[in-house]
Amino acid sequence: MKVHVRKSDTVVVISGKDKGKTGEVLKVYPKTGKVLVQGINIVKKHQKANKSQVESAIIEREAAINSSKVMLYCNKCKNATRIASKILDDGTKVRVCKKCSETF
């Protein structure tokens, strides 16, 4: 499945319990179509105690969400935006904001 965001992009969550929050993409899972976003979809994981390592605890961490629930955030527009592809004069393909034409 093709994912429209990349690692280190700033995105806005458009649906779900974290709607309206922004965060940076930490990891992209193209096979499942999910993304891991910093500070979004926090879940509690019950850590079992090991003999040699750590004690048991409840750890809060991010869980992956579907890529269709996020949109790229444009710093110039200060809003979530759709993206378009544009080919520059030197032949490189870049992503641009559909509203203000700023490159990402």
Swiss-Prot record:
Subunit structure comment from the entry: Part of the 50S ribosomal subunit.
Protein name: Large ribosomal subunit protein uL24
Keyword Transmembrane tagged: no
SMART domains to which the protein is assigned, alphabetical: KOW
Annotated PANTHER family: MITOCHONDRIAL RIBOSOMAL PROTEIN L24
BP-aspect Gene Ontology terms: translation
Keywords, in A-Z order: Ribonucleoprotein, Ribosomal protein, RNA-binding, rRNA-binding
GO-annotated molecular function: rRNA binding; structural constituent of ribosome
Function: One of two assembly initiator proteins, it binds directly to the 5'-end of the 23S rRNA, where it nucleates assembly of the 50S subunit.
Keyword presence, Lipid metabolism: no
Family according to the record: Belongs to the universal ribosomal protein uL24 family.
Pfam families, per the entry: KOW, ribosomal_L24
Record gene name: rplX
Record Gene3D superfamilies: 2.30.30.30
GO CC terms of this entry: ribonucleoprotein complex; ribosome
